[in-house]
């Protein structure tokens, strides 16, 4: 089974003072590098969605793309709508979508998603659930469903949660919430 990763690094990072969150340092290393180190052993290809510092991100993966102009400023859905037209991503069996600000993702993230997907073969989308919350921005999806994000966004809807509900996505339970800590502020980075 061929699984690709799409790392979302295209947010405005308003809680980070506008600093490019993916390039913010945690322990002397960029957040996105922590995420790449966690997902690289689990996938066969990594793409990065980013709207700035394209050259810097290209050092990490040759497969980078900014949000298409018509989708900019709609959050993670912008990246999904743009990815819907990416021919290379379309060749994957599954697409792991993760944000660039979660440096502690579990080493068995894809394996857990794969196990559940084999038990529920008619389901095309999954997301992370922990004892504390749902993490809709961590998805395991069939690339074919990305096309549905376009009319969803055109309809005025903007949340990942509602889009995933439309896809009849199922949660996959992870017991340790710490793996999914997102570092959104400079204080988070200092405490991280």
Curated annotation (Swiss-Prot):
Domain of life: Bacteria
GO BP: bis(molybdopterin guanine dinucleotide)molybdenum biosynthetic process
Cofactor dependency: Mg(2+)
Cited InterPro entries: MobA-like_NTP_Trfase (IPR025877), Molybde_CF_guanTrfase (IPR013482), Nucleotide-diphossugar_trans (IPR029044)
Binding positions for Mg(2+) per the UniProt entry: 101
Subcellular location: Cytoplasm
Pfam families named in the record: NTP_transf_3 (PF12804)
GO cellular component: cytoplasm
Keywords: Cytoplasm, GTP-binding, Magnesium, Metal-binding, Molybdenum cofactor biosynthesis, Nucleotide-binding, Transferase
Catalytic reactions of this protein: Mo-molybdopterin + GTP + H(+) = Mo-molybdopterin guanine dinucleotide + diphosphate
EC number: 2.7.7.77
GO molecular function, a single term: metal ion binding
Protein family according to the UniProt entry: Belongs to the MobA family.
PANTHER family: MOLYBDENUM COFACTOR GUANYLYLTRANSFERASE
Written domain comment of the UniProt record: The N-terminal domain determines nucleotide recognition and specific binding, while the C-terminal domain determines the specific binding to the target protein.
Protein name per its UniProtKB record: Molybdenum cofactor guanylyltransferase
């Amino acid at each position: 089974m061929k699984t690709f990763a799409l790392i979302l690094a295209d947010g405005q990072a308003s809680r980070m003072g506008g600093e490019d969150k993916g390039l913010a340092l945690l322990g002397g290393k960029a957040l996105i590098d922590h995420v790449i180190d966690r997902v690289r052993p689990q996938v066969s290809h990594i793409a990065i969605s980013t709207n700035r510092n394209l050259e810097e991100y290209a050092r990490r993966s040759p497969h980078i793309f900014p949000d298409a102009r018509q989708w900019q400023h709609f959050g993670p859905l912008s990246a999904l709508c743009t990815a819907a037209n990416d021919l290379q991503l379309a060749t994957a069996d599954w697409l792991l979508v993760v944000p660039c600000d979660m440096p502690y993702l579990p080493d068995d993230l894809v394996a857990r998603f794969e196990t559940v997907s084999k038990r529920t073969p008619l389901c095309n989308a999954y997301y992370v659930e922990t004892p504390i919350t749902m993490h809709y921005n961590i998805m395991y999806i069939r690339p074919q469903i990305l096309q549905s994000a376009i009319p969803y966004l055109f309809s005025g809807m903007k949340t990942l949660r509602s889009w995933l509900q439309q896809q009849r996505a199922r949660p996959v339970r992870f017991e340790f919430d710490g793996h999914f800590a997102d570092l959104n502020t400079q204080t988070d980075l200092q405490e991280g």
